[in-house]
Amino acid sequence: VYREGLDRDGSLFAEAGPTGLVDASKSWWAQAEAVVGFYNAYQLAGKPHFAEAAARCWEFAQARLVDRRHGDWFKRLNQDGTPDDATYKAGPWECPYHHSRACFEMLSRLNDGSRPGAL
């Protein structure tokens, strides 16, 4: 994921396969889980580039996914970076689980003084 799934802006692509990029859109849940996943890799491996990837993904989410006008996160950004108006913020398969979990998880990890190799 680190080598092939990240866009230049720090975000995670929606989907890739053996033949390459399939969907360059950005989904809220993938960005949220990438923050935790990359930070987890940093804690396990101690390699700073994973912490940097987590931070860049978080910065992307804050800059592009957070809906500052109506609240919550946009669930999907089109390939051109605009919010996908066809997706709901909440529904049978959409809820604030992933981004809430990422925030709680990162607050816990950043506040407990854990260092690489501490997991």
Say what each PLM segment does.
Residues V1-L119:
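Glycan-recognition and catalytic cores of secretory/periplasmic carbohydrate-active enzymes
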